[in-house]
Amino acid sequence: MIRIQHLLYKISLSVVFGLITSSLFAQLTMGAKGLGMGQATTAIPGYEWALFANPALLNSDNAAIGFYGLRNYGFAELTDMSATGSVPTKLGVAALGFHRYGDNLFSETRIRFGYKNDWQMLHFGVVANYNHISFGADYGSGGALGLDVGIAAELAEDLWIGARSTNVNHPEYGDIDEELAREMAIGFTYGLNELAVFAFDVVKDVRFPVSYRGGLEIAVIEDLKGRVGITTEPLSYSLGFGYGKDRWSFNFAVQKHELLGFSPGIDFMLYF
């Protein structure tokens, strides 16, 4: 009886989300801070999860490791889990990341190697991204290697511009003839005397309409920050907060999809 109920639950889940296919893809942008700011992460300087956003803005100040989890729409089967680590060196910043989405019926795994450097006012980064998808039972699997690039610059004090492009080599899973997601984005951020940060992105996935993303971070009290954001295509709203010290930080956010409901995300960072 329990197995039958579990099977019916799986079937219902597949039917419901099969009706809204554009929402089934794993999150490409990681981190609860970015989630709380509407995923407008293309131009946030020193963003801890820049390896999954714009690699040109990897943190150059400290070595860091972090862990992130997101439960999409409250379903355990649609969970994103990821980890990241970065180390500044004399030759630039090296970074390594891992991301997994899904369950035993369908899963997507990404392993990312990133590098960032700068020349005068220009910051640039590149990521080699191995993607692997697996279908349950004997339905097969596939892998592909993608290449992401990003650039960024500080136009004026606390005013940043960034741009990125994912999978510029047009990779595809050979055995199943499926292309990886390809996305281009440009973004701006402006910091207001350490009291607030405004972020705005324009993102175009080749499969979907243009998405506009905006976010705001406000310093509430010492070491505590509040965040709100909005994303279009699909329409979603988000809010969250972050608290941190010199050696660690903690971030939490909730995203509300216009049709599918709430997705809570949490991350924890350590700095060395």
Question: Which residue ranges define each predicted feature?
Answer:
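Bacterial N-terminal signal peptides that target proteins for export
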Residues: 2-15
